[in-house]
């Protein structure tokens, strides 16, 4: 049978092992993803320490919130980085653009380790920290699109899914690297020293990873597809207007976001970060144990990025990604409920035998998910009751009470009326403070009697089943994420590929995915049900499933050398 030809008139090569040059391309491109997730896990793991170092002029609660907002700033600006660096990548080339992105990203991480604290330079410290986070977010906005485009344009026909899927595996490497450095430094110098200044070391040692990344990327050549296009004088002079100003391309960008990356992102974050937060915040599993179980699930699951990437070269990208979204929609609720039974059986039993309800006048109940509200802002009887339950991760059902009535908490067959708080000079007055303290004590005692545990009991935990359930969540991640880079690359023409694929990827992963933990826990806090946060990823994944199935075509046989 005659060999098929690409748009260059070159026969598609027969299957062969990966060459040393291709291995170098994948390795160099993947280092940026390692850097991205190394920093991500560092900042997330050290958020409490960073809050004390850079936001110490605020009260403890507000400091932690602003530390998380600084964290979120990096996500929010990623789409803008996609526009800036995507444009450069389509105009001057992939190689030098994603060399610039890793320099900015790496130096931003390194400088955090040098940044003086609030105690030293005052308000300049948090301002500079947020600026560094935004710089890094901008660079990250150009990094993934560059890496995916570069690897795909170096990949032989029939191997793009397999080759680009290696980029996704490095997120796990970033996690393990950050855990190794944090644990090593913390154990080596002790908790007190680590909290004082030792936390800087994990940020500072990132300069070594940056040095290796830059050295390797400098030795790479430009992608064949871009070289061909440049030689023919077909590079885009205005990739932004071509990508987003022409409906035929803008339509594909919108479809890529709604029908691919939004669902991929929420499945990704649900399977790793939300699962971790659910274990620690809702199921009260010790943080070290939870991290180790997540790490075990990732270790088992990571090879499946390549498995599904390779499989997508044979059966297509679309069916695998859509199947991952479908399985997420169908299995999230039962899997997370099984997690409760496996990781904290005492809690599962208490919820089944002594459910908690809050009966209150809905008009007196505030939104419990407000991240900047102070304790005194929750002063109604309803707010005081729900606030205590939310802070102690106790699920409850809402029952509408009579207008003007005080809130009543029912635990099994016990009922406790919540007081109303009276605020004087920005604090609860003495009488209110005593009543609130007595209410909290009564609720705590009744919860204990009803069997609600203060924390998960390691002796009763089914660790094997917990890891298997977490592995299932990671497996769904590999299904939606393994083939995604190849599919995004194949959806857009070479001349505007970097720009066009970067924006939907980073809106999906920066906004829909990056803000998932905050959004999901706000839903939990507002509704009182520990599982209701799952509605956010389920709805988004469901929308992606419908739009992707109906409106996105298969791309595995697309000729990426075509410029039309």
Where do the language-model regions lie?
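Hydrophobic core of transmembrane alpha-helices in multi-pass small-molecule transporters
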Residues: 115, 121-141, 346-361, 460-479
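C-terminal ends and interior cores of transmembrane alpha-helices
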Residues: 56, 103-122, 327-349, 449-457
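Multi-pass alpha-helical transporter architecture, strongest
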Residues: 213-220, 335-342, 540-564
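Central cavity-lining transmembrane alpha-helices of secondary-active solute carriers
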Residues: 68-87, 106-108, 173, 295-308
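Extracytoplasmic gate region of multi-pass secondary transporters
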Residues: 43-44, 249-297, 335-336, 363-399, ...
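Low-complexity, proline/glycine-enriched hydrophobic segments characteristic of transmembrane helices
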Residues: 337-468
């Amino acid at each position: 049978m005659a060999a098929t030809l690409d748009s260059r008139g070159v026969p598609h090569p027969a299957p062969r092992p990966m060459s040393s040059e291709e291995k170098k391309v994948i390795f160099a491109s993947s280092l940026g993803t390692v850097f991205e997730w190394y920093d991500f896990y560092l900042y997330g793991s050290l958020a409490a320490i960073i809050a004390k170092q850079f936001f110490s002029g605020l009260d403890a609660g507000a400091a932690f919130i602003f530390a998380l907002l600084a964290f979120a700033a990096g996500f929010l600006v990623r789409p803008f980085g996609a526009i800036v660096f995507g444009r450069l990548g389509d105009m001057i080339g992939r190689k030098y653009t994603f060399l610039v992105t890793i320099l900015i990203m790496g130096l931003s991480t390194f400088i955090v380790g040098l940044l003086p604290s609030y105690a030293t330079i005052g308000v300049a410290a948090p301002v500079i920290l947020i600026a560094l986070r935004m710089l890094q977010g901008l660079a990250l906005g150009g990094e993934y699109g560059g890496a995916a485009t570069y690897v795909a344009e170096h990949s032989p026909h029939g191997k793009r899914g397999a080759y680009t899927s290696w980029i996704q595996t490095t997120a796990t490497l970033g996690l393990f690297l950050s855990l190794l450095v944090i644990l090593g430094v913390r154990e080596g110098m002790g908790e007190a020293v680590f909290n004082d200044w030792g936390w800087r070391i994990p940020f500072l040692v990132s300069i070594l990873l940056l040095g290796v990344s830059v050295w390797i990327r400098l030795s790479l050549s430009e992608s064949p597809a871009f070289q061909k296009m440049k030689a023919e004088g077909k590079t885009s002079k205005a990739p932004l207007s071509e990508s987003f100003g022409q409906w035929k391309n803008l339509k594909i960008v919108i479809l890529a976001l709604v029908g691919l990356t939004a669902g991929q992102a929420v499945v990704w974050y649900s399977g790793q970060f939300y699962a971790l937060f659910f274990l620690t915040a809702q199921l009260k599993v010790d943080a070290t144990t939870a991290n180790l179980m997540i790490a075990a699930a990732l270790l088992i699951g990571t090879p499946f990025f390549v498995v599904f990437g390779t499989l997508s070269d044979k059966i297509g990208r679309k069916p695998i990604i859509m199947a991952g979204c479908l399985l997420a929609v169908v299995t999230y609720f039962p899997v997370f409920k099984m997690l409760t039974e496996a990781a904290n059986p005492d809690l599962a039993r208490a919820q089944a035998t002594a459910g908690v309800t809050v009966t209150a006048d809905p008009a007196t109940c505030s939104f419990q998910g407000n991240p900047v509200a102070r304790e005194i802002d929750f002063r109604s009887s309803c707010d005081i009751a729900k606030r205590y339950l939310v802070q102690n991760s106790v699920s409850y059902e809402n029952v509408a009470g009579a207008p003007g009535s005080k809130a009543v908490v029912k635990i099994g067959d016990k009922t406790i009326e919540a007081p109303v708080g009276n605020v004087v000079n920005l604090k609860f007055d003495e009488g209110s403070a005593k009543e609130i303290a007595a209410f909290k004590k009564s609720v705590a005692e009744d919860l204990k009697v009803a069997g609600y545990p203060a924390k998960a009991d390691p002796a009763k935990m089914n660790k094997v089943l917990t890891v298997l359930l977490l592995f299932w969540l990671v497996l769904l991640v590999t299904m939606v994420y393994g083939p995604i880079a190849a599919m995004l690359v194949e959806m857009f023409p070479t001349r505007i590929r970097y720009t066009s694929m970067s924006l939907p990827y980073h809106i999906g992963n920066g906004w829909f995915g990056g803000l998932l933990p905050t959004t999901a826990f706000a839903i939990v806090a507002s509704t009182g049900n520990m599982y209701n946060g799952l509605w956010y990823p389920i709805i988004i994944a469901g929308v992606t499933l419908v739009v992707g199935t109906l409106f996105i075509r298969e791309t595995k046989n697309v000729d990426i050398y075509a410029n039309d």
